[in-house]
Amino acid sequence: MKPLRQSLPLIFGLALLGLCSSSLAQSPLFAPIYEVLTHPRCLNCHTATDFPRQGDERRRHDQLVVRGDDNHGAPTLQCSACHQDRNVADDEVPGAPHWALAPLSMAWEGLSPQELCVALKDLDKNGNRDLNDLLHHMSEDALVLWGWSPGKNRSRPPYEHEEFVRLLSLWVNAGGPC
């Protein structure tokens, strides 16, 4: 009986550690990245639906367009019918090169911080990008950059792009901890 009694503090400590680890699972390095990637500028196109969303309230696209087989809309209503390489019509119609929905494999809608972190590093879900490719994509891609220049009446992600890239670099250089 004595060995069990001596083991109780260790058992209790391990159990407590297990309880705490799930609540502390999110890496502090990933927290600001999650905050940006779950902002409407990102989630409206990284949606888990068969249609794009728009606005900060993330309503269904006004023209009722659908994803289409190639994520560029249905054959009779492609994204490029309205969305050009830059914002047009007094910034009412947003635009950037290769305007399209992210593939469903890149849907972030509804993911927890842990799930999104894991998905970002999953080559089958992220466009076959390693962490450095992901950093380059989020630093240089014109469609990503549009999120920080969305035109009037559209909010921007919570960090300036330069700061986001700095924070993303810290996360990448640390090995992408979740």
Listing of model-derived features with the role each one plays in the protein:
Residues 28, 40, 74-77, 163:
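Short, well-structured alpha-helical interface segments that form or flank functional binding sites
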Residues 38-49, 76-86:
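The canonical Cys-X-X-Cys-His
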Residues 43-75:
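N-terminal, post-signal-peptide region of Sec/Tat-exported proteins
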